[in-house]
């Protein structure tokens, strides 16, 4: 086992603090509308330029192992805030730095670290409940645009694009961000339920010019098994032929005689039919077939439920306005399922997402949720160079997360104002002793840090602006982009409550742990021994006798 280097007390805390400050100072320059860029060196290719706090934090590794521990703990704050709310990483880092700096000063002055931590925790709990009181719902597209714009570093086109996407696919819809091919940002929306399964035979194609199958007002048969015998399908095919509507068959597989007969019937015009495989595998396939049956108001024919395909009737079939099938995808548009049933199914899937522990399962459940909710939107980011493209894509993803967070928990006035107002409201709370009171004051002072940093990055005097904001009430704050004071909500400067809340909670949690640190242990660096057995380099080895 390698030898360890151990540091105690103040010596350990000073080293840790140095690491915290290096990381936080690099991250905080990106905060606010006039935040600066950070250039990150890459081992290959051009350096990347970013204004995204978490991207900067992830790049930082320090040579001194004790300092690096401090930096890594703050990095954890940024990553946690990013995972939960998708944004607020810079705010979280800044809050953690402010609490740690003030807290360690108090420890050095002889305060009890445990009581300081209790005071900080008490202030954070009270601040979070006040934030919830201050929060207002974010429901209209104007507010969504504003939140997206602020999070994308005042890029209005991004805010508008996200708002449009949410309007088209609903707040639960899936919105993905991709690198575009042009200079302009684009929005592409796939309406209805789409899954990755194409037609089983090209002979089903009825639109040869585009190579797709299009069915208007079709019946939809969903079967949870492999079909190879045409006899099982004959009764339902006859019933559909009489109704003169097209039919889509979704099954585990369709092969042999059954597929050949369907192709012949389709080509002769006896019945307009198309067949596709069911999406997914195993239990997920059953669940997705169930989703389709709810969306189209049909019944899933399943042998597990002792249902017989031969005995199925038109009542068992689902219906939709239109179905479009390509080589690789099937899209069911405007299914005739009842809104109430679909809503219940969505609630059920949301519950499963909350209970799921696997990221992969969560991702798949979210996909199902989106397909039921009304579609998928793809934001294609345009830029002139690859460096700009990567930077912009990261900003758009941040803005998208922030907007989702805003819809979920509402918004508070932005620009650091919400935390200042919350700190004013809880300024009278007291702990059980004087050391806890100091902890509370440390947290309250730290809540001013985001506003001070936004002002500092815009080139103004932080103390003057902070005092002016404190003298105001409600949403009154400072707009760093235009250098004016006023109502932050009217300025359109909004922060999602979830982002501000999680930044404060994680910063308070990790900062409390750092203040109560008394000992740090790390591996001693290995000394590289010089190898004395290597002969002096005086020429080519083995050729001494030729001289």
UniProtKB/Swiss-Prot annotation:
GO cellular component, one term: cytoplasm
Function, as annotated: Together with its co-chaperonin GroES, plays an essential role in assisting protein folding. The GroEL-GroES system forms a nano-cage that allows encapsulation of the non-native substrate proteins and provides a physical environment optimized to promote and accelerate protein folding.
NCBIfam families per the UniProt record, alphabetical: GroEL, PRK00013.1, PRK12849.1, PRK12850.1, PRK12851.1
PANTHER family: 60 KDA HEAT SHOCK PROTEIN, MITOCHONDRIAL
Protein name in the entry: Chaperonin GroEL
Compositionally biased tracts (Gly residues): 538-547
Subcellular location: Cytoplasm
Sequence segments annotated as region (Disordered): 526-547
Keyword field: ATP-binding, Chaperone, Cytoplasm, Isomerase, Nucleotide-binding
Biological process (GO), any one: protein refolding
Any one Gene Ontology molecular-function term assigned to this protein's record: ATP binding
Entry-linked Gene3D superfamilies: GroEL (3.50.7.10), GroEL-like equatorial domain (1.10.560.10), TCP-1-like chaperonin intermediate domain (3.30.260.10)
Quaternary context: Forms a cylinder of 14 subunits composed of two heptameric rings stacked back-to-back. Interacts with the co-chaperonin GroES.
InterPro entries: Chaperonin_Cpn60_CS (IPR018370), Cpn60/GroEL (IPR001844), Cpn60/GroEL/TCP-1 (IPR002423), GroEL-like_apical_dom_sf (IPR027409), GROEL-like_equatorial_sf (IPR027413), TCP-1-like_intermed_sf (IPR027410)
Known EC number: 5.6.1.7
Catalytic reaction(s) noted: ATP + H2O + a folded polypeptide = ADP + phosphate + an unfolded polypeptide
Top-level taxonomic group: Bacteria
Predominant cellular place of this UniProt entry's protein: cytoplasm
Residues binding ATP, per UniProt: 30-33, 51, 87-91, 415, 479-481, 495
Record organism: Buchnera aphidicola subsp. Tetraneura caerulescens
């Amino acid at each position: 086992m390698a030898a360890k280097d151990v540091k105690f007390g103040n010596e350990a805390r000073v080293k840790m603090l140095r690491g915290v400050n290096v990381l936080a100072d690099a991250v905080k320059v990106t905060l606010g509308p006039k935040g600066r860029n950070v250039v990150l060196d890459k081992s290959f290719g051009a350096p990347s330029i970013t204004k995204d706090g978490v991207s900067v934090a992830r790049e930082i590794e320090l040579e001194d192992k004790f300092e690096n521990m401090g930096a890594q703990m703050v990095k954890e704050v940024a990553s946690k805030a990013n995972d939960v709310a998708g944004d607020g990483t810079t705010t979280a880092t800044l809050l953690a730095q402010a609490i740690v700096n003030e807290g360690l000063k108090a420890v050095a002055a002889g305060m009890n670290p445990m009581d300081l931590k209790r005071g900080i925790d008490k202030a954070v709990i009270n601040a979070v409940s006040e934030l919830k009181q201050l929060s207002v719902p974010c429901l209209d597209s104007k507010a969504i645009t504003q939140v997206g714009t602020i999070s994308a570093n005042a890029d209005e086109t991004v805010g508008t694009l996200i708002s449009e996407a949410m309007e088209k696919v609903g707040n639960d819809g899936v919105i993905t961000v991709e690198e575009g091919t042009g200079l302009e940002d684009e929005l592409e929306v796939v309406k209805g339920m789409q899954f990755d399964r194409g037609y089983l035979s090209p002979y089903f194609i009825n639109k040869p010019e585009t190579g797709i199958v299009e069915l208007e007002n079709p019946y939809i048969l969903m079967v949870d098994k492999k079909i190879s015998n045409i006899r099982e399908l004959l009764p339902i095919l006859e019933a559909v032929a009489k109704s003169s509507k097209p039919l889509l068959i979704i099954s585990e597989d369709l092969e042999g005689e059954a597929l050949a007969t369907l192709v012949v019937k389709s080509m002769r015009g006896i019945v307009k039919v198309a067949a596709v495989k069911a999406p997914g595998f195993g239990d997920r396939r059953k669940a997705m077939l169930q989703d389709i049956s709810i969306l189209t108001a049909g019944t899933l024919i399943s042998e597990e439920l002792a249902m017989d395909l031969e005995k199925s009737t038109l009542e068992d079939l689902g219906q939709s306005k239109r179905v479009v099938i390509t080589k690789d995808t099937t899209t069911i548009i405007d299914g005739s399922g009842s809104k109430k049933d679909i809503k219940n199914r969505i609630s059920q899937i949301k519950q499963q997402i909350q209970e799921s522990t696997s990221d992969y399962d969560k991702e798949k459940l979210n996909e199902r949720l989106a397909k039921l909710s009304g579609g998928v939107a793809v934001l294609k980011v345009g830029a002139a160079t690859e460096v700009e493209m990567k930077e912009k894509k990261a900003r758009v993803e941040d803005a998208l997360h922030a907007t989702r967070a805003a819809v979920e928990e509402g918004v508070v006035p932005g620009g650091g104002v919400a935390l200042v107002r919350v700190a004013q409201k809880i300024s009278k709370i007291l702990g059980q002793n004087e050391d806890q009171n100091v902890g509370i004051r440390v947290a309250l002072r730290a809540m001013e840090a985001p506003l001070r940093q936004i002002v500092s990055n815009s080139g103004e005097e932080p103390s003057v602006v902070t005092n002016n904001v404190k003298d105001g009430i409600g949403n009154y704050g400072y707009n760093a982009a235009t250098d004016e004071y006023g109502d932050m909500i009217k300025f359109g400067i909004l922060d999602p409550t979830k982002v501000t809340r999680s930044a404060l909670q994680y910063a308070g949690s990790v900062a409390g742990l750092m203040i109560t640190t008394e000992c740090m242990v790390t591996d001693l660096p290995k000394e590289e021994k010089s190898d004395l057995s290597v002969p002096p380099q005086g020429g080519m080895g083995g050729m001494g006798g030729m001289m």
